[in-house]
Amino acid sequence: MHNVVSVDGFIADGNDAVGPLHDWYFSGDTPITGGGDQRYDHSGGGSGFKVSRASAEYVRKMWDGIGVIVMGRNLFDLVNGWEGSPPTGDHVVVVSHRPKPEGWHPEASYHFVDDVAAAVVRAKELAGERDVAVNAGDVGAQILAAGLVDEVAMDVVPVVFGSGKRYFGNIDGQLLLEDPHVVIQGDRVLHLKFKVRRAGHDA
């Protein structure tokens, strides 16, 4: 499960605006590249992602390992499914009770599933030996609560939102994570990864 997050745990404000959360994607000199000369460019303005060297190495390694993205319908609608071309991975699974919009990018490998558990099963089938990346937020929280998330990745930005859309959605209950096994300082961002502690694990 992954997303960019404020220090107080929000991935967007109440109107789904990310404010300064994504500024670090454009604050450095090193482009994020993958697959040879292919550039990950989903800035909307064609400027591409240019980050610090530390962030570029971290993000490149993570994105290169992803085969499938799992996202909620709200994010799909906000970004129009990245116009059928996700930032990484070969497939996208959208958790939604509504089908794919008629005529929307028929060439794109987007799969609409109305249940989070079924979405994870489908994503694993599509991913093969590669990773399944779950977008944090309401859908990510449901998948985490169902015990279907192995790792929590957070790109923590030094800003306080105070309110908005939470990284962990409306999750109700306590879940323990292991100590972070990845801690990388970028420019205006701290990259963290935690394994999810399973029930019965002794501290």
Regions found by a protein language model. Name each.
Residues 1-146, 158-203:
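Portal/gating segments that form or line small-molecule/metal binding sites
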